[in-house]
UniProtKB/Swiss-Prot annotation:
Gene3D superfamilies: 3.30.300.20
Location(s), subcellular: Cytoplasm
GO molecular function list: ribosomal small subunit binding
GO CC terms: cytosol
Membership in a protein family: Belongs to the RbfA family.
Gene that specifies this protein: rbfA
Self-association and partners: Monomer. Binds 30S ribosomal subunits, but not 50S ribosomal subunits or 70S ribosomes.
Function: One of several proteins that assist in the late maturation steps of the functional core of the 30S ribosomal subunit. Associates with free 30S ribosomal subunits (but not with 30S subunits that are part of 70S ribosomes or polysomes). Required for efficient processing of 16S rRNA. May interact with the 5'-terminal helix region of 16S rRNA.
Record protein name field: Ribosome-binding factor A
């Protein structure tokens, strides 16, 4: 009987849920803000985990560029505490060493969506006013 998912995939899914709960309930650092765990890459031996996070306060237009750096640094500083809480929440022989990385896929997706919307809007304007295209 074949397994649908490997053990590392199952552990990473459960770890993603647990870390998201820990960030939401336990981490009180204001530099972290509203952090969302978007994915986890786990090594085959389950000793290392790369946690990808997004910050919702970065999505606003008036966001400080250093917000991401400060948030990742705060999470790196709290990684030992997060790892301790993770060890209590999950039954693993070895709790992985956590490293945090910023996941910009949400912002890139929004940028791509805006580009597509602008192209569609320009295309509709050109269809309505076919002669105005030559004036530009």
């Amino acid at each position: 009987m074949a397994k649908e998912f490997s053990r590392s995939q199952r552990v990473s899914q459960e770890m993603q849920k647990e870390i998201a709960l820990i960030l939401q309930r336990e981490i009180k650092d204001p530099r972290v803000g509203m952090a969302t765990v978007s994915g986890i890459e786990l090594s085959r031996d389950l000793a290392y985990a790369k946690v990808f996070v997004t910050f919702l306060n970065v999505l606003t237009d008036n966001a400080d560029p250093d917000t991401v750096k400060n948030g990742i640094k705060a999470l790196q500083d709290a990684s030992g505490y997060i790892r301790t809480l993770l060890g209590k929440a999950m039954r693993l022989r070895i709790v992985p060493e956590l490293t945090f990385a910023y996941d910009n896929s949400l912002i890139e997706g929004m940028r791509m969506s805006n580009l597509v919307s602008n192209v569609i809007k320009n295309d509709v304007e050109r269809q309505v006013n076919p002669g105005s295209d030559e004036e530009k």
